[in-house]
């Protein structure tokens, strides 16, 4: 049975190899080639770098999407040039060919199944016939005016200037403005200058951006410049801004920046995740920002000294924070702030909260006791990170008794008890070991923990040692490795 299923596939493969042996013939008969032959023939031409064949195949591609990114694990500028040349030939025609189907050039590595399906790797569950049925609606010819071709790629800017691939596509899209849209669901800028970043934002189709991360929001003027583009990103789901504390501003300038940014948030009706990391522009004005959120957030991260008393006080007030699934207030210097507002917020989101980060917040026993009743009601909590705080053995015992009922917890981190530290705050392992055993005994009286860490430990997500960087947010909440 297996031979009978695989044999036709093998014959198609051999036919494709034979056809590519005569490049002129292959090009001449593409219009009559069965669509089942296109994917294996394209893979063969791609592997053997028959660039002229690829160029012509793009023009006759019989599917709505060409998932080139899953074939090209690393960008190949030569092949990209030939593919774009083929598309240009199509776009230059006033009357589109009969077999015109291509609507999307996918440069992300997201659709490897397409090639395995058509190469026969899964002939039973995903046959060409089944694939054809799924694409019936997509393959229907469009009527009316020509739709722009969409080119999908993610943008990660780690240098001050664009790399060759991005520069090439940026120039091509600008040349073909109106007929080609550069769509980037994710745009990340680590270090590119504001001028070059502006050029990128002017090229990318703004409605396509769903995730935007800016790690160098250091210039006040960048907020104003950036806001103009941000307001056009109507489908933005995640916004991350970092490092905006390099310059001190006058109160008038700060109020102007807050007003500018608040007006932008009013336009982002689909925003679900907001991360503000080491940004001082908004300190003391969080109320104004939260008030402008159009829809409930799933994730709120305000980290590295962002919060003041007035900021924390406003958090429980607004409906936009009533359905939080993730909350991160790490490195927030909460030692001198009353935590009753945090308790009120935890009570409000007790039914939805899944992840809570209160890392290195300066929370001592008296502050901890304020939030414990609310914390014990967060029945869906799966991750709780509390390490880096100044907590005694009695405080940790009380904390574990309150979290003992949280049966969904799969990851929890706690500081070493104060009694196990020396005068410099370093852990004395001989003291920590028996205290840790006692804490585990107390917890096991109510539930069996899954992953639990006390004191300085390696990150359970990536293994990085916190002796160098005590941040658990670099895996789940911060900059990727």
Curated annotation (Swiss-Prot):
A single cellular component GO annotation: cytoplasm
Keyword RNA-binding part of the UniProt annotation: no
GO biological process, one term: negative regulation of apoptotic process
GO molecular function, one term: ubiquitin-like ligase-substrate adaptor activity
Keyword list, A-Z: Leucine-rich repeat, Repeat
Originating gene: PRAMEF22
Family: Belongs to the PRAME family.
LRR repeat windows: 99-126, 181-205, 206-232, 233-267, 268-293, 294-325, 326-344, 350-377, 378-402
Identification of the protein by name: PRAME family member 22
Signal peptide (UniProt feature, chain positions): none
InterPro entries: LRR_dom_sf (IPR032675), PRAME (IPR026271), PRAME_domain (IPR050694)
């Amino acid at each position: 049975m297996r031979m009978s299923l695989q044999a036709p596939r093998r014959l198609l493969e051999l036919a494709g190899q034979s056809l590519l042996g005569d490049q002129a013939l292959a090009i001449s008969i593409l219009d009559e080639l069965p669509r089942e032959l296109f994917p294996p023939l394209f893979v063969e031409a791609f592997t053997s770098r028959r660039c002229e064949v690829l160029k012509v195949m793009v023009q006759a591609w019989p599917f709505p999407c060409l998932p080139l990114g899953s074939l090209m694990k690393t960008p190949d500028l030569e092949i990209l040039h030939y593919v774009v040349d083929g598309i240009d030939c199509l776009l230059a025609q006033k009357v589109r060919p009969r077999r015109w189907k291509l609507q999307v050039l996918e440069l992300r590595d997201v659709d490897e199944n397409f090639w395995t399906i058509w190469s026969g790797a899964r002939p039973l569950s995903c046959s060409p016939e089944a694939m054809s049925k799924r694409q019936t609606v997509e393959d229907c010819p469009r009527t009316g005016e020509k739709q722009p071709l969409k080119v999908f790629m993610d943008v990660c800017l780690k240098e001050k200037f664009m790399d060759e691939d991005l520069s090439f596509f940026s120039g091509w899209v600008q040349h073909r403005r109106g007929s080609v849209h550069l769509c980037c669901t994710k745009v990340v800028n680590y270090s590119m200058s504001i001028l070059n970043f502006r050029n990128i934002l002017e090229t990318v189709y703004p409605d396509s951006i769903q995730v935007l991360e800016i790690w160098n929001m250091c210039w006040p003027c960048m907020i104003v410049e950036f806001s103009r583009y941000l307001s056009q990103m109507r489908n933005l789901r995640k916004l991350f801004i970092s490092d905006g504390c390099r310059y001190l501003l006058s109160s008038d300038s700060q109020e102007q920046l807050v007003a500018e940014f608040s007006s932008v948030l009013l336009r982002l009706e689909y925003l679900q995740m907001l991360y503000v990391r080491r940004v001082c522009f908004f300190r003391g004005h969080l109320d104004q920002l939260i008030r402008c959120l159009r829809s409930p957030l799933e994730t709120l991260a305000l980290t590295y000294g962002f919060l003041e008393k007035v900021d924390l006080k406003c958090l429980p007030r607004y409906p936009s924070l009533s359905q939080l699934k993730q909350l991160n207030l790490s490195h927030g210097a909460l030692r001198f702030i009353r935590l009753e507002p945090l308790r009120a917020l935890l009570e409000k989101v007790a039914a939805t909260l899944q992840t809570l980060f209160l890392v290195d917040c300066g929370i001592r026993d008296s502050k901890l006791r304020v939030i414990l009743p609310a914390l014990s009601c967060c029945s869906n909590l799966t991750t709780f990170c509390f390490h880096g705080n100044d907590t005694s053995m009695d405080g940790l015992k009380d904390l574990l008794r309150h979290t003992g009922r949280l049966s969904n917890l799969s990851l929890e981190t706690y500081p070493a008890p104060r009694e196990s530290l020396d005068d410099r705050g370093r852990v004395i392992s001989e003291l920590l070991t028996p205290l840790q055993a006692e804490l585990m005994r107390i917890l096991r009286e109510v539930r069996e923990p899954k992953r639990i860490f006390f004191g300085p430990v390696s990150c359970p997500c990536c293994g990085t040692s916190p002796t160098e960087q005590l941040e658990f947010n670099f895996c789940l909440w911060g900059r990727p490795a």
